[in-house]
Amino acid sequence: MRVLVSNDDGVDAPGIKILADALRNAGHEVMVVAPDRDRSGASNSLTLDTPIRAKQIDMHTYSVAGTPTDCVHLALTGLLNYDPDIVVSGINNTGNLGDDVIYSGTVSAAMEGRFLGLPAVAVSLVTLYREGQQAPQYETAAHAAINIVAQLKTDPLPADTILNVNVPDVTWQQMRGFKVTRLGNRHRSAPCLTQTDPRGHTIYWIGPAGPEQDAGPGTDFDAVRNTYISITPIHVDLTRYQALENVTRWTDRLTAHMDWPT
C-alpha cells in the first residue's frame, strides 16, 4: 500500500521515524509529510493567512512549516504526484485518550485524511517514561500499527471511520491484546500557570490536563491501564443525534411568541 505518514511531534521525532521504517519493512511504500517542529495541540487548525513552505528532506520525506492538518491537506491536494491509499498519523509521544482527541494534532492529521477520502489511523504511545526509566516502547506501537494497516487492506472499515489507537508503553510480549473502546473523558483542566517576564508583564502557560473522570470499563483509559491496545472508532460528524428531539421542543418554546415575518 502507499502510506502517507504524518504526526504533530515534528518530522524529526523518534515516533514517526520508527513508524515509517516499520511500514517500509512491512512492504509498504511510505511518504512522510510532517511539521518542521513540534505542533502538539494544533487540533484541526489549517493555515489560511500565510503561504506554507514545504522542504523535501529526501526522496521519502517532506518537512512542512505548518500544522499537522496542513501537512496532510498539502500532501493530498498537490504536493505529491500520486494518491496514497491510507493516512497513518503518529507515533505520538503520549496518549490521546478521551477528550484529548479534541486538541490532538495526531488525531487531526488522521481526520484530515478522512475528510479527503482516505482510510485513516492515529497511533499514540501512552508513555510512562521518566528520567532513569526504560525508553518509550515505540516499536510496540509500530508493530500494532503495521498489523492494523494490514487488516484494513484486506478488511476495510466504513468510509466515515477513523481509528484512534492508544498503545500501552510496554513490550509487545507484555501486551494482552486489542480492545475496541469508547472515548472516556477527564475532569476540568488545572488552572493556567502565571509568571512574570523580564519586562514585568504577566505571562500565562496552559495548565495540565485534568485527571481521568469517565475512565471505567469500556473506555480507552481502562483498556490501556489494563495493558490492552485501545482502538476507538471515531468520526467527524459532531451532531448529537440523541438531542435533536429535545432541542426541537426547546426551540419551539423559544420561538412560540416571536413575530416572524410571513
Swiss-Prot record:
Quote the cofactor binding remark.
Answer: Binds 1 divalent metal cation per subunit.
Q: Which UniProt keywords apply?
A: Cytoplasm, Hydrolase, Metal-binding, Nucleotide-binding
* Principal place of residence: cytoplasm
Q: Where in the cell is it found?
A: Cytoplasm
The chemistry this enzyme catalyses reads: a ribonucleoside 5'-phosphate + H2O = a ribonucleoside + phosphate
Q: What is its EC number?
A: 3.1.3.5
Tell me which cofactor or cofactors this protein depends on: a divalent metal cation
State what this protein does. Answer: Nucleotidase that shows phosphatase activity on nucleoside 5'-monophosphates.
Instruction: Quote the protein name from its UniProt record.
Output: 5'-nucleotidase SurE
The gene name on file is surE
